[in-house]
Amino acid sequence: MSRLRRFNRKILSLSSDYTHDGESDQEDVSILPLDTEEQEELIQKFETNAHITNKLYINLLSILYLLYGGLLMILVRKSRGYIKLALLAGANSLICSCITLRYDIVNDYLLFKKFKLRVSNFSINIINIILLVLMAWISFNHVVEDKKTVLCLQVPMFLFWVAVLVKRWARNIEDEIADLRCLKYKYKNA
């Protein structure tokens, strides 16, 4: 019986030696094999943490899009001619970027009971790219003398690429977590 107790103490001391000190809000993660329930709990923690951080980033970026879109709409009221058209295209581009960032859209609409219109993130991105090209064309051909306005009109293009990258990053994290679920091994702790 004493041998068994010594063996248990050695095992328990080994497991405490091989724990990794994580953040203060997370439990210690052992590098010893995890049983299936512990694996599922760990994957659930990863999934929850990824979901929370994705929501935080998406909400912060959405606020940024709305604030900058509001600024562009204020500038639209004060401007004329080609600048007004470019600013309107930039504001609409920000709206499209915000929609594709926040939502996964696939809808079919019937127009006049004959035509079927499919609206998806891909089609919204195509419209967004057309708006960005229009805005860039106007800004480089007609607003060349005012560098501040040209720079102001390039921000929606930058925010479009930020939305694309954040969406891709979130999708990659989801794929990695799905791959992690496939890598679970069967281990029962006696």
Swiss-Prot record:
Key words of the record: Membrane, Transmembrane, Transmembrane helix
Source organism, top-level taxon: Eukaryota
Ranges of the Cytoplasmic topological domain: 1-55, 102-123, 171-190
Transmembrane segments: 56-76, 81-101, 124-144, 150-170
GO cellular component: endoplasmic reticulum; membrane
Location relative to the cell: Membrane
Extracellular topological domain: 77-80, 145-149
InterPro entries: UCP010056 (IPR016564)
Topology in the lipid bilayer: Multi-pass membrane protein
PANTHER family, sorted: HISTONE-LYSINE N-METHYLTRANSFERASE
Miscellaneous note of the record: Present with 238 molecules/cell in log phase SD medium.
Protein name (Swiss-Prot/TrEMBL): Uncharacterized membrane protein YGR016W
Lineage, opening ranks: Eukaryota, Fungi, Dikarya, Ascomycota, Saccharomycotina
